Amino acid sequence: MAYYSRGGMGSLPPVVRTFLIVNVVVFVAQSLIPGLTEWGSLHYWTSSQFRPHQLITMMFMHGGFTHILFNMLVLWMFGSVLESFWGSKRFLNFYLICGIGASVVTLLSVPFTAAQFAKTASEASEGYGSLQIIEMYKQQYAALGASGALMGVMAAFAYLFPNTELMIFPLPIPVKAKYLIPFYFLIDLFGGLGIGLVGDNVAHFAHLGGAIIGLVIVIIWNRTNRKTFY
């Protein structure tokens, strides 16, 4: 059984290194440029703030230091392996497809999550009906983060390297990828279906969409022995 660990930062492949730099630069810019976060975050398509570019830009926006730190660690750990295994062009296309696909799934899921939220909120609100709450939810909805694309990366990693052992804080023992990453998927599935905390400000369906799209792509590539995707 292999024990998984990454080498030094100097060994980073070019696409992963570029994405790390871009995400950090954008994160700093978010605190310096008024309106940048709203411009780049994904709004629902009936909102006056929705723009098509947000399907891409949302994956380079983050909501806080912990958010970007975790995502960049995932990109470094798993993305570096996949880029080295596939090559830069193939990894770039894979990452962007997973990210854009996650954005589309997010938009498709908004009516469902809005109804979930309205069911809970209408019980505590005064003067607002469920339909009004749903419409306000849609107009105010905004999603951001690289997590959708990265769930696709993690799903591909688990498929290609299922027995690789991962050390995940705070667990004291290594866990194989084929167990750990499906566990994260189930957390998002339960969260997306409202089994647990509703309105937890996590785009669970973006994560699920990215993971499913990533898994489908890597299965197709593996079965057809495709060496390129560009």
Where are each of the predicted segments found?
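A detector for small-residue-rich transmembrane helices and their helix-helix packing motifs
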Residues: 1-230
